Regions:
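Conserved catalytic Lys-bearing alpha helix of Rossmann-like short-chain dehydrogenase/reductases
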Residues: 103-110, 119, 162-170, 232
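Alpha-helical substrate-binding/gating segment
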Residues: 192-195, 200-217, 224-252, 261
Length: 310
């Protein structure tokens, strides 16, 4: 019988971890770490140990890394600044840089601790926002159809910048210049949430297209960005278990987009398919077909035609 891998999971009280933990518990021997022991609803996460991975004294949490085969880094600390969540029209956005720097320092601590402990691989949650300038400036303007992980990671906000920093920092550790090659897989997660049409007909909670864009424009966008629960589970399993994640230059470092096989996708899955063997099972156009017909394509559709846009 094959030995169960030991996986350290950070940020286990968060939303994405909540979707993954049941499957992870079945497949691996887990070590669970977060800065708090309860999830968003105040429920205790079984098995979690409280530790602050952003603290500069890595000896405080080195024990969690020792003997682990892989680290799944989902930890994130939101900046202590009130923001509206509306891209391009958020007066609080300028004040988020220091908070995001703390998250970059946490990523550094994770990479360094993994390297020191002999961990083979770190799988880190990056974000589609690591290169969201292309989406904001080009995709929704009809000037570009697809964004690839091979494109220079350019973001127009500090959250996206910090995620791009995770990626480039990971390359330093994967390059072998620090003594050995730490394998690093970066997951640019899309929209791992419900994107049914009713969410987009009222007041928007988040705005990803452009300030003042319609809810239906955001509905189309999120249909392209959607990541189903089972595709999320598959992607993470493959990121942890794939034997060889070396790129064409022999460096074990890969950036992949985390979306389902969506008809309206505008992010490339090429590296996820080629390197990880990811084979998405779901498509938002099918999963939310009733809303697509009602709002976008039926006789009473409220939106103009086109894959994206209002």
């Amino acid at each position: 019988m094959a030995r169960r891998m030991t996986v350290l999971v950070t940020g286990v009280s968060g939303y994405v971890a909540g979707q993954l933990l049941p499957d992870l518990r079945r497949r691996y021997t887990l070590r669970l770490v977060d800065v708090r022991a309860t999830d968003r609803r105040g429920r205790r996460v079984p098995g979690v140990e409280v530790a602050d991975l952003a603290h500069p004294d890595r000896d405080r949490y080195a024990r969690f890394f020792r003997g682990a085969d892989a680290v799944l880094h989902l930890g994130y600390r939101p900046p202590d600044v009130k923001t509206t969540g509306v891209w391009g029209a958020d007066p609080g956005a300028l004040e988020t840089c220091d908070g995001e720097l703390a998250n970059v320092r946490m990523a550094q601590n994770v990479y360094r601790s993994a390297l020191d402990a002999g961990v083979r691989r770190v799988v880190a949650a990056s974000s589609n926002h690591a290169a969201d300038w292309y989406e904001h400036a080009l995709v929704h303007a009809g000037r570009r159809d697809v964004v690839s992980p091979a494109d220079l990671p350019l973001s127009d906000n500090f959250y996206g910048w910090s995620k791009a920093a995770y990626e480039l920092l990971g390359f330093v550790y994967a390059s072998g210049s620090l003594g050995r090659k730490l394998e690093v897989v970066l997951l640019r997660i899309g929209a791992p949430r419900d994107v049914s049409g009713r969410r987009y007909l009222g007041k928007l909670v988040e705005q990803h297209v452009a300030p003042g864009a319609s809810g239906l424009a955001n509905f189309k966008r999120d249909l392209g960005a959607w990541l189903s629960p089972r595709d999320l589970r598959q992607l993470v399993r493959r990121a942890i278990e794939k034997r060889d994640v070396r790129n064409a230059d022999g460096v074990p470092w890969v950036v992949v987009y985390g979306i389902s096989g969506n008809t309206r996708a505008f992010w490339s899955l090429e590296s996820a398919r080629r390197v990880l063997g990811y084979a998405p099972q779901d498509d938002s156009e099918v999963a939310f077909a009733k809303d697509v017909r009602r709002l976008l394509s039926g006789p009473r559709a409220r939106a103009r035609g086109g894959r994206l846009g209002a």
